[in-house]
């Protein structure tokens, strides 16, 4: 009986959220037309797990191809996961190679997260304990950017980390806020992940319940909504077998105040990124006031 209740409750929740999501799509279409004004600028934000820091910085070929790809995409802000072997100085050197003069890292050991930008950034806080591989809080373009990478192996720890992030956002009253990174968790909107794994929805549901909006869901078709694994892993199957294993665990969320400014999103899961990392990058585009 409990299992049946859980299934029905989950279906109800999905239906409710799907209805809200459909309305958001319509609202953003209107916003897109409304915001073609001279006092606004369009920006692009990308989040990318770069797989062991390009083998602790030793894989020069991957670094070169990554740099070329970032230059082509020209994001205004780039969040990075798994900066293994990087110091902040090394991250600034990498960022400069693709046109970002500003960079920050949460720590200089383990699996750090970082942020690079075309425009000045201010580090507000670096949280370590209780936040997976860390939570980096930076101010860029008058918005609060939170970059994280949640626990990869323990769903209960992931849930606690998600709760800590929501508490941090609430206690600091971050109204114009973006949260991004490898969450190692699944969204209830991704129907290919069946209800046999309802417990894996807890992290993303926690963010949604706190009015954080999943922008890739709003703009990305079901059959393109996957960010892991790529073809770089030797153990990855091919063709349809690979597609059955692919899942979405990388996200960009925004708070209520920024939702209507978002006009597009993409998971860059094409051939250009098949062999740069084991994750595909995710990105959003939005309008903000000109500075």
Can you name each region flagged by the protein language model?
Residues 43-50, 66-88, 145, 165-194, ...:
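Active-site beta-strand/loop signature of hydrolases that rely on acidic residues for catalysis
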Residues 80-154:
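Structured beta-strand-rich core segments of catalytic domains in phosphoester-bond hydrolases
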Residues 10-21:
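Bacterial N-terminal signal peptides
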Residues 54-55, 148-158, 187-193:
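Surface-exposed cleft-lining segments at the edges of enzyme active sites
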Residues 2, 6-9, 23-94, 290:
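N-terminal, active-site-proximal structural segment of metallo-dependent hydrolase catalytic domains
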Residues 27-34, 126-127, 170-174, 188-291:
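Metal-dependent phosphoester-hydrolase catalytic domains
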Residues 62-66, 87-91, 158-165, 199-203:
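Stable alpha-helical elements in mature extracytoplasmic
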Residues 52-58, 79-80, 155, 216, ...:
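Short, solvent-exposed loop/turn elements at domain surfaces
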